[in-house]
Regions:
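Ferredoxin-like alpha/beta domains used as RNA- or RNAP-binding modules
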Residues: 1-194, 217, 237-261
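Basic (Lys/Arg-enriched) interaction patch that binds polyanionic ligands
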Residues: 184-235
Length: 261
Protein backbone atom coordinates (compact mmCIF):
# COMPACT_ATOMS: atom_id res chain seq x y z
CA UNK A 1 0.00 0.00 0.00
CA UNK A 2 1.53 3.34 -1.04
CA UNK A 3 1.33 6.55 1.00
CA UNK A 4 -1.77 7.94 -0.71
CA UNK A 5 -3.66 4.67 -0.36
CA UNK A 6 -2.70 4.43 3.31
CA UNK A 7 -3.94 7.95 4.01
CA UNK A 8 -7.19 7.33 2.13
CA UNK A 9 -7.70 4.16 4.19
CA UNK A 10 -7.04 5.89 7.53
CA UNK A 11 -8.93 9.15 6.97
CA UNK A 12 -12.56 9.32 8.04
CA UNK A 13 -13.42 12.26 5.76
CA UNK A 14 -12.16 13.89 2.59
CA UNK A 15 -11.07 16.92 4.63
CA UNK A 16 -9.05 14.69 6.96
CA UNK A 17 -7.44 12.98 3.98
CA UNK A 18 -6.39 16.30 2.43
CA UNK A 19 -4.98 17.49 5.77
CA UNK A 20 -2.91 14.33 6.18
CA UNK A 21 -1.52 14.64 2.66
CA UNK A 22 -0.45 18.27 3.27
CA UNK A 23 1.06 17.58 6.69
CA UNK A 24 2.94 14.46 5.67
CA UNK A 25 4.31 15.97 2.47
CA UNK A 26 5.55 19.01 4.40
CA UNK A 27 7.28 16.93 7.06
CA UNK A 28 8.68 14.48 4.52
CA UNK A 29 10.26 17.32 2.57
CA UNK A 30 11.75 18.81 5.75
CA UNK A 31 13.30 15.49 6.76
CA UNK A 32 14.77 14.93 3.29
CA UNK A 33 16.25 18.44 3.13
CA UNK A 34 17.16 18.55 6.84
CA UNK A 35 15.39 21.87 7.35
CA UNK A 36 13.03 22.88 10.18
CA UNK A 37 9.32 22.64 9.52
CA UNK A 38 6.14 22.81 11.58
CA UNK A 39 2.47 22.25 10.92
CA UNK A 40 -0.55 24.03 12.32
CA UNK A 41 -2.04 22.68 15.54
CA UNK A 42 -3.43 19.16 15.29
CA UNK A 43 -6.08 17.39 17.33
CA UNK A 44 -5.21 14.19 19.19
CA UNK A 45 -6.75 12.12 16.43
CA UNK A 46 -4.81 13.98 13.75
CA UNK A 47 -1.60 13.46 15.72
CA UNK A 48 -2.30 9.73 15.93
CA UNK A 49 -2.88 9.54 12.18
CA UNK A 50 0.33 11.45 11.39
CA UNK A 51 2.26 9.07 13.65
CA UNK A 52 0.76 6.11 11.81
CA UNK A 53 1.57 7.45 8.34
CA UNK A 54 5.07 8.69 9.25
CA UNK A 55 5.95 5.80 11.52
CA UNK A 56 9.68 5.81 12.21
CA UNK A 57 10.25 9.35 10.93
CA UNK A 58 12.19 11.72 13.26
CA UNK A 59 9.26 14.03 13.94
CA UNK A 60 7.96 15.34 17.24
CA UNK A 61 4.88 17.03 18.64
CA UNK A 62 4.80 20.23 20.67
CA UNK A 63 1.97 22.06 22.37
CA UNK A 64 3.83 24.25 24.83
CA UNK A 65 3.08 22.18 27.91
CA UNK A 66 3.43 18.48 28.65
CA UNK A 67 -0.33 18.22 29.21
CA UNK A 68 -1.30 19.92 25.93
CA UNK A 69 -3.89 18.20 23.77
CA UNK A 70 -3.57 20.31 20.64
CA UNK A 71 0.00 20.21 19.33
CA UNK A 72 1.97 21.05 16.22
CA UNK A 73 3.96 18.36 14.46
CA UNK A 74 7.48 19.37 13.54
CA UNK A 75 10.89 18.31 12.35
CA UNK A 76 13.99 19.88 13.90
CA UNK A 77 17.48 19.33 12.46
CA UNK A 78 20.22 18.42 14.91
CA UNK A 79 21.43 22.01 15.10
CA UNK A 80 18.12 23.19 16.64
CA UNK A 81 16.57 22.30 19.98
CA UNK A 82 13.01 22.65 21.25
CA UNK A 83 13.63 26.19 22.51
CA UNK A 84 13.62 27.33 18.88
CA UNK A 85 9.93 26.47 18.60
CA UNK A 86 8.90 29.34 20.86
CA UNK A 87 11.74 31.74 20.05
CA UNK A 88 11.45 34.89 17.95
CA UNK A 89 11.74 32.93 14.72
CA UNK A 90 9.91 29.84 15.94
CA UNK A 91 6.45 28.69 14.81
CA UNK A 92 4.64 28.95 18.17
CA UNK A 93 3.83 31.91 20.42
CA UNK A 94 1.90 32.30 23.68
CA UNK A 95 -0.72 35.00 24.23
CA UNK A 96 -2.43 36.33 27.35
CA UNK A 97 -5.81 38.07 27.18
CA UNK A 98 -6.51 39.88 30.45
CA UNK A 99 -9.95 41.07 31.57
CA UNK A 100 -11.69 42.33 34.70
CA UNK A 101 -12.11 39.52 37.22
CA UNK A 102 -15.74 40.48 37.78
CA UNK A 103 -16.43 39.28 34.24
CA UNK A 104 -16.98 35.55 33.91
CA UNK A 105 -15.69 34.09 30.67
CA UNK A 106 -15.40 30.46 29.60
CA UNK A 107 -13.36 28.42 27.16
CA UNK A 108 -16.32 28.53 24.79
CA UNK A 109 -16.48 32.33 25.03
CA UNK A 110 -12.83 32.67 24.04
CA UNK A 111 -12.93 30.07 21.29
CA UNK A 112 -16.00 31.74 19.81
CA UNK A 113 -14.39 35.17 20.04
CA UNK A 114 -11.22 33.94 18.34
CA UNK A 115 -13.20 32.36 15.52
CA UNK A 116 -15.25 35.55 15.24
CA UNK A 117 -12.03 37.52 15.00
CA UNK A 118 -11.29 35.71 11.76
CA UNK A 119 -8.60 33.19 12.71
CA UNK A 120 -8.85 29.50 11.88
CA UNK A 121 -9.10 26.82 14.55
CA UNK A 122 -5.93 25.09 13.37
CA UNK A 123 -3.89 28.21 14.23
CA UNK A 124 -4.94 28.01 17.90
CA UNK A 125 -3.59 25.54 20.45
CA UNK A 126 -4.97 24.80 23.90
CA UNK A 127 -6.91 27.56 25.66
CA UNK A 128 -6.52 28.02 29.42
CA UNK A 129 -9.06 30.24 31.18
CA UNK A 130 -8.56 31.46 34.74
CA UNK A 131 -9.85 34.38 36.80
CA UNK A 132 -9.09 37.58 34.96
CA UNK A 133 -7.04 36.03 32.17
CA UNK A 134 -6.91 33.55 29.35
CA UNK A 135 -3.64 32.12 28.06
CA UNK A 136 -3.40 30.27 24.76
CA UNK A 137 -0.91 29.25 22.11
CA UNK A 138 -1.02 30.33 18.48
CA UNK A 139 0.98 29.89 15.31
CA UNK A 140 3.39 32.78 14.83
CA UNK A 141 1.76 33.81 11.54
CA UNK A 142 -1.44 34.95 13.27
CA UNK A 143 0.24 36.57 16.29
CA UNK A 144 0.53 40.15 14.89
CA UNK A 145 -3.08 40.06 13.70
CA UNK A 146 -4.39 38.89 17.07
CA UNK A 147 -2.40 41.45 19.02
CA UNK A 148 -4.05 44.19 16.97
CA UNK A 149 -7.54 42.81 16.47
CA UNK A 150 -8.46 40.48 19.34
CA UNK A 151 -9.92 43.21 21.52
CA UNK A 152 -13.00 41.66 23.11
CA UNK A 153 -14.83 38.46 23.96
CA UNK A 154 -18.52 39.20 23.73
CA UNK A 155 -18.99 42.51 25.53
CA UNK A 156 -15.89 42.05 27.66
CA UNK A 157 -12.87 44.16 26.72
CA UNK A 158 -9.51 42.41 26.57
CA UNK A 159 -5.91 43.51 27.02
CA UNK A 160 -3.85 41.20 24.82
CA UNK A 161 -0.08 40.70 24.94
CA UNK A 162 2.51 38.13 24.01
CA UNK A 163 4.01 36.16 26.88
CA UNK A 164 6.71 33.51 27.08
CA UNK A 165 5.48 29.93 27.09
CA UNK A 166 6.76 29.12 30.63
CA UNK A 167 4.47 31.89 31.93
CA UNK A 168 1.34 30.22 30.56
CA UNK A 169 -1.04 29.74 33.48
CA UNK A 170 -2.82 26.39 33.54
CA UNK A 171 -5.81 26.26 35.91
CA UNK A 172 -6.45 23.08 37.85
CA UNK A 173 -8.59 20.69 35.83
CA UNK A 174 -11.96 20.23 37.52
CA UNK A 175 -13.24 16.68 37.42
CA UNK A 176 -16.03 14.59 38.85
CA UNK A 177 -15.33 11.03 39.94
CA UNK A 178 -18.13 8.61 39.19
CA UNK A 179 -18.60 5.11 40.59
CA UNK A 180 -21.40 3.20 38.98
CA UNK A 181 -22.54 -0.19 37.76
CA UNK A 182 -23.37 -0.92 34.14
CA UNK A 183 -24.90 -3.97 32.45
CA UNK A 184 -21.98 -4.17 29.99
CA UNK A 185 -19.03 -2.17 28.70
CA UNK A 186 -20.89 -1.06 25.59
CA UNK A 187 -20.10 2.48 24.54
CA UNK A 188 -23.67 3.71 24.92
CA UNK A 189 -23.80 2.40 28.49
CA UNK A 190 -20.55 4.10 29.50
CA UNK A 191 -21.66 7.38 27.88
CA UNK A 192 -24.97 7.11 29.73
CA UNK A 193 -23.20 6.57 33.06
CA UNK A 194 -20.46 9.15 32.56
CA UNK A 195 -22.75 11.98 31.49
CA UNK A 196 -25.79 11.03 33.60
CA UNK A 197 -28.13 10.71 30.63
CA UNK A 198 -30.43 7.92 29.53
CA UNK A 199 -29.02 5.11 27.46
CA UNK A 200 -31.42 6.04 24.66
CA UNK A 201 -30.12 9.61 24.65
CA UNK A 202 -26.55 8.33 24.67
CA UNK A 203 -27.34 6.16 21.65
CA UNK A 204 -28.73 9.21 19.83
CA UNK A 205 -25.52 11.18 20.36
CA UNK A 206 -23.44 8.24 19.13
CA UNK A 207 -25.52 7.45 16.04
CA UNK A 208 -25.56 11.17 15.14
CA UNK A 209 -21.77 11.11 14.79
CA UNK A 210 -21.13 13.25 17.87
CA UNK A 211 -19.00 10.71 19.74
CA UNK A 212 -15.30 9.87 19.60
CA UNK A 213 -13.70 6.85 21.25
CA UNK A 214 -9.98 7.42 21.83
CA UNK A 215 -10.21 10.40 19.47
CA UNK A 216 -11.60 8.33 16.58
CA UNK A 217 -15.21 8.81 15.40
CA UNK A 218 -17.51 6.02 16.53
CA UNK A 219 -21.16 5.61 15.56
CA UNK A 220 -21.70 2.15 17.04
CA UNK A 221 -23.35 2.16 20.44
CA UNK A 222 -22.51 -1.51 20.95
CA UNK A 223 -18.77 -0.89 20.59
CA UNK A 224 -16.97 -2.43 23.57
CA UNK A 225 -14.88 -0.14 25.77
CA UNK A 226 -11.93 -0.87 28.05
CA UNK A 227 -9.96 0.67 30.91
CA UNK A 228 -8.22 3.97 30.03
CA UNK A 229 -10.51 4.63 27.06
CA UNK A 230 -11.23 8.32 26.50
CA UNK A 231 -14.67 9.26 25.21
CA UNK A 232 -15.67 12.69 23.97
CA UNK A 233 -19.21 13.68 23.05
CA UNK A 234 -19.84 16.94 21.24
CA UNK A 235 -22.08 19.08 23.41
CA UNK A 236 -21.43 17.05 26.57
CA UNK A 237 -17.67 16.96 27.14
CA UNK A 238 -15.09 14.29 27.89
CA UNK A 239 -14.91 11.26 30.15
CA UNK A 240 -12.33 8.55 30.84
CA UNK A 241 -13.04 4.98 31.90
CA UNK A 242 -10.52 4.63 34.71
CA UNK A 243 -11.29 1.21 36.13
CA UNK A 244 -13.39 -1.86 35.47
CA UNK A 245 -14.07 -3.91 38.59
CA UNK A 246 -15.89 -7.08 39.41
CA UNK A 247 -19.54 -7.96 39.05
CA UNK A 248 -22.32 -7.31 41.52
CA UNK A 249 -24.66 -10.07 42.68
CA UNK A 250 -27.02 -9.02 39.91
CA UNK A 251 -24.30 -9.38 37.30
CA UNK A 252 -23.68 -5.69 36.69
CA UNK A 253 -20.13 -4.46 36.15
CA UNK A 254 -18.56 -1.95 38.56
CA UNK A 255 -16.84 0.96 36.81
CA UNK A 256 -14.99 4.11 37.81
CA UNK A 257 -15.23 7.06 35.43
CA UNK A 258 -13.66 10.52 35.43
CA UNK A 259 -15.74 13.29 33.92
CA UNK A 260 -13.79 16.41 32.94
CA UNK A 261 -15.73 19.57 33.77
Amino acid sequence: MDRREQIAHLAATREEEMLLVRVCEKLDTAVQRDIPAATNFLSKREQMLVCEVLRGAPIRFFGGLSTAEREISCYLPDYLDEDWLTGEDGPVAAVRAAFFERDTLTHRDFLGALMGCGVKRETIGDIYVAEGRCDFLVTREVLPYLLQNFLSAGRTKLHVERIVVPDVSVPEQKVRQIRDTVPSLRLDGIVSSGFSISRGKAAEYISAGKCELNYAPCVKGDKQTAESDVITVRGLGKIRLDAVGGNTKKGRICVEITRFL
